[in-house]
């Protein structure tokens, strides 16, 4: 893991903590505003603003039936781009059975 940033941006850190909580603790059920607020120690109004912003970008989605939030498809697409950028998965660097 990377070292802690010298000048962290608190809002970004809170948004990432929220995404990590949804990823690790809620499964397909998602989480409500109160649950996220309690789990992260963040005020409900801040959680609402974070959720609204993350939903706008497609990183989370809200179930209209349950009013709970879960990870969205845009976040999945971001994750898919990681292997393409990681040298461990760079096929050009793998040894070829045809090279001498």
Regions found by a protein language model. Give the residues of each.
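Conserved segment of winged-helix/HTH DNA-binding domains
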Residues: 74-100
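N-terminal helix-turn-helix
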Residues: 2-83
